[in-house]
Design a protein with these regions (language model features):
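N-terminal glycine-/serine-/threonine-rich beta1-alpha1-beta2 phosphate-ribose binding loop
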Residues: 1-79
């Protein structure tokens, strides 16, 4: 199955909603691809690490530009 790798910038209210929605989407919608919570950015590396663990992202960063420049990220969701 094809993968769509998600990069999420920001974990405030909308970022939290989007992270939960990406994780639950396969239980609600028939998808042709697996959504992978790949990369999360927050204002500091410490907060990014905490939120990545909380939401199940594979990687984290304190600089949103890392996500935008990463060729392994298919979707950048700016929250």
């Amino acid at each position: 199955m094809k993968q769509v790798r998600i990069g999420l910038v920001g974990t405030g209210y909308i970022g939290r909603c989007h992270a939960i929605a990406y994780a639950q989407a396969p239980t609600v919608f028939p998808l042709d691809a697996e959504l992978v919570l790949e990369y999360l950015a927050e204002i500091t590396p410490e907060l990014a690490e905490k939120k990545a663990k909380e939401f199940g992202f594979n990687r984290f960063t304190g600089d949103w530009r890392d996500i935008v420049q990463d060729p392994n990220v298919d979707v950048v969701d700016i929250c």
